[in-house]
């Protein structure tokens, strides 16, 4: 079936490639940094013929007669560019790309400065960042690694490719941060289709909101939200890449789109495959070889049960830019994952061998978007996803192993086996979690005029879950639980744009509804019949907030935002997940937080060939009923294989600041630096202390330089250098007030360095890149002190067809 799907995609693209596109001009309009400029004007002078670029900055002009023509491109706030092109018999399909430089114009006494999507998002008042993926798509970089370079964002990963990931925004992590794909909660897609596996080439841009989340996302997050915006597919293109590197890591992806100009019929498809042995070197207190007499010897060894594979794809058919829809798509998303498990929550003395997880998902999706729906100013968008997800936990190997990768030998010289018959002490299992999942995101907005806009949004997500286990009898399976979790989040927002666009205000309210239903078959009191023990919870909550910005001068913008945020417990926190060693907690309650951000943005200052932008944000969070691990010495032990999320008694407070600097010179040199410093405190054993397992001080820096016409005319060489710093932090509270020996719980200070280069060949359709990660092979640790891979090398080939 997988091979048939791949062949079908191949023939579809080959057929599309053969279409006749004679007499057609295509291309893109971007700023000098390569960021798309939507709705730029492209006109052929003398023909009274022109178009506007789409949301991705691409344009197409058809039926252009033979001969020479002058093409003029303009965009408010940017300089006008013109080029002469020629349509002739041997070259009827011409591609022309434009880069526009930012300018400041004065129209009737009003200063107008062009804004890209990135600038517009980051100056609305929210503590927000827009991350472009254009350069990262050409390199051997995962989407998570790209996020990790962003100010205030820290990726918490339990190992190498495919390992469990948590996203930390200003110190708040886990389910406190919501992740979306085009506004749909990513949890709907399951572990086999996540940011570990989705390559940057599938992504248009990433929006990061810290602390305060706008109403249109309808999110139940107290830490913030990350919204992955996929490419819309308004331009004929095909992109294929393959990357290979250390640890036998292979990553491939194929994505493309075809649009019939006359009918608007559009096809989008993408596919990916990732694999890694993840057999990197590790060391530490618990990494030991155990002799038959029980003597433990510290060793440096390789992980040996940590391979990862994921395969998936998405295909959509529909129409774009037609009279009845800006976008209409129906499609399918399919994914499959295999993930070996090396250890439990902590890196314990006894590693796992033979324990692995398998996941798959098959989901249908529908998208409809239309501006000026029925009446001018009324915009509508609806996205729906429905499908099935399965996860199998396979743990049937009883043999005990040491970190040397060999069998554990007993006093009698014979290999040992665990008495419980599996790697995990809970006993052998082939547990299956089957889920029916659904989510619908709908939104209406009405623009009264240039100053006032109202938005109404609703997000529904539901999970119907059924557990079973092939390793237990049919009778025992009748006692497996069934679980349902439903969420509704409704938001109403008002946007004000006043004083010649100097003041922007976004005020919103949110209403949250959650229903939990758990059915557990049990024997009645006299053990004569099986009855259903039902737990049901129906609760609703209300939150609200605002964001505001004021332009003091064209280069100084003040920003502030605040929200009373609610975070509803997630499915795994409520029902548990044996694959992640999580125990259920049916009575867990939502957590709440009062969040506030105050900051400013300076720039962009253009000083001849120099460009400088500086932004900073001060933030505070007051979290009550916090959901977390019982991270004190009595409630959480390193020997624990299972953990349970619970509501922690004491309030937590997060206060800190973040700052970011961008510098560019002559569009060739780019430098960025960001810093984030905070205190995240609570009370433990009567003493105020920092919340464990949370990095409090991080810095990132990046340097890029571009050589044009390197070796070959019209070629480009880009060099990249990045460095990452994380200060030491504890992953557990010390026992009581006595801090003697607490260094055992410290994750040490860490600095790592990456280097990369990409070479674009003259026709811009072939790119070769090379990356070195963790150049100096430093020991890097992360979530709960799990060590991450050392130095690694990767080579990537990209082939791009921008028009066919």
Predicted region positions:
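Membrane-embedded beta-barrel scaffold of Gram-negative outer-membrane proteins
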Residues: 559-563, 591-647, 653
């Amino acid at each position: 079936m997988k091979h048939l799907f791949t062949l079908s995609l191949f023939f579809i693209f080959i057929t599309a490639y053969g279409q006749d596109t004679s007499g057609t001009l295509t291309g893109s309009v971007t700023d000098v940094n390569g960021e798309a400029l939507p709705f730029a004007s492209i006109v052929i002078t003398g023909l009274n013929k022109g178009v506007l670029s789409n949301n991705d900055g691409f344009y197409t002009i058809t039926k252009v007669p033979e001969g020479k023509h002058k093409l003029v491109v303009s965009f408010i706030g940017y300089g006008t560019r013109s080029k002469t092109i020629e349509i002739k018999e041997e070259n009827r399909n011409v591609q022309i790309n434009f880069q526009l430089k930012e300018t400041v114009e004065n129209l009737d006494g009003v200063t107008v400065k062009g804004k890209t999507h990135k600038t517009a998002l980051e100056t609305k008042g929210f503590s927000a960042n827009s991350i472009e993926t254009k350069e990262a798509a050409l390199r051997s970089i995962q989407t998570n690694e790209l996020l990790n370079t962003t100010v205030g964002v820290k990726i918490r990963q339990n190992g190498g490719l495919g390992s469990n990931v948590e996203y930390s925004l200003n110190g708040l992590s886990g389910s406190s941060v919501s992740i979306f794909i085009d506004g749909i909660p990513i949890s709907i897609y399951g572990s086999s289709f996540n940011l570990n596996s989705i390559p940057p080439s599938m992504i248009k841009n990433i929006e990061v909101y810290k602390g305060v989340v706008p109403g249109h996302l309808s999110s139940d997050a107290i830490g913030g939200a990350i919204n992955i915006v996929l490419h819309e597919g308004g331009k004929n293109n095909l992109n294929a890449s393959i990357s290979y590197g250390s640890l036998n890591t292979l990553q491939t992806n194929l994505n493309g789109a075809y649009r019939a100009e006359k009918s608007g019929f559009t096809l989008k498809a993408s596919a990916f495959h990732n694999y890694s042995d993840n057999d990197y070197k590790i060391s530490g207190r618990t990494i030991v070889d155990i002799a038959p007499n029980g003597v433990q010897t510290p060793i440096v060894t390789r992980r040996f049960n940590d391979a990862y594979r994921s395969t998936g794809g998405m295909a959509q058919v529909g129409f774009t830019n037609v009279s009845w829809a800006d976008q209409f798509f129906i499609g399918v998303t399919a994914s499959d994952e295999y993930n070996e498990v090396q250890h439990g929550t902590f890196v314990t003395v006894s590693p796992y061998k033979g324990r692995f997880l398998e996941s798959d998902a098959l989901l249908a999706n529908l998208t409809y978007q239309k501006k000026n729906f029925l009446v001018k100013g009324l915009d509508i968008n609806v996205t729906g996803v429905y499908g099935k997800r399965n996860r199998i936990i396979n743990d049937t190997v009883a043999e005990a192993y040491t970190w040397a990768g060999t069998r554990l030998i007993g006093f009698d010289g014979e290999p040992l086996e665990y008495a419980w018959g599996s790697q995990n002490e809970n006993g052998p299992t082939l547990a299956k979690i089957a889920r029916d999942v659904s989510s619908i995101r709908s939104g209406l907005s009405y623009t009264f005029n240039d100053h006032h806009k109202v938005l109404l949004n609703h997000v529904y997500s539901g999970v119907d879950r059924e557990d079973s286990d092939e390793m237990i009898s049919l009778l025992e399976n009748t006692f497996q639980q069934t679980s349902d979790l439903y969420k509704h989040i409704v938001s109403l927002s008002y946007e004000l744009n006043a004083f010649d666009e100097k003041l922007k205000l976004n005020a919103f309210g949110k209403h949250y509804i959650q229903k939990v239903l758990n059915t557990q078959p049990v024997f009645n009191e006299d053990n004569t019949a099986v009855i259903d023990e039902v737990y049901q919870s129906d609760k609703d909550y209300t939150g609200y907030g605002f964001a505001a910005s004021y332009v003091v001068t064209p280069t100084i913008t003040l920003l502030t935002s605040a929200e009373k945020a609610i975070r509803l417990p997630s499915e795994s926190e409520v029902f548990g997940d044996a694959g992640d060693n999580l125990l259920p907690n049916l009575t867990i309650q939502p957590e709440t937080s009062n969040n506030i951000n105050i900051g400013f943005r300076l720039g962009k200052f253009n000083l001849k060939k120099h460009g400088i932008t500086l932004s900073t944000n001060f933030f505070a969070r007051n979290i009550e009923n916090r959901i977390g691990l019982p991270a004190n010495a009595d409630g959480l032990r390193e020997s624990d294989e299972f953990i349970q999320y619970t509501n922690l008694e004491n309030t937590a407070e997060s206060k800190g600041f973040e700052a970011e600097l961008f510098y560019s010179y002559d569009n060739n040199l780019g430098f960025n630096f960001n810093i984030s410093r905070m205190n995240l405190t609570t009370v433990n054993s009567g003493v105020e202390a920092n919340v464990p397992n949370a990095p409090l001080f991080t810095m990132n820096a990046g340097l890029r330089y571009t050589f044009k016409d390197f070796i070959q005319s019209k070629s480009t060489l880009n060099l990249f250098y990045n460095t990452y710093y994380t200060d030491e932090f504890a992953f557990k509270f010390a026992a009581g007030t006595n801090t003697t020996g607490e260094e055992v719980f410290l994750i040490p200070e860490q600095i790592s360095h990456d280097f990369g280069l990409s070479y674009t060949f003259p026709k811009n359709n072939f790119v070769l890149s090379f990356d070195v990660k963790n150049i100096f092979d430093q020991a890097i640790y992360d979530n709960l002190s799990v060590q991450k891979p050392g130095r690694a090398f990767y080579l990537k080939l990209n082939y791009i067809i921008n028009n066919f």
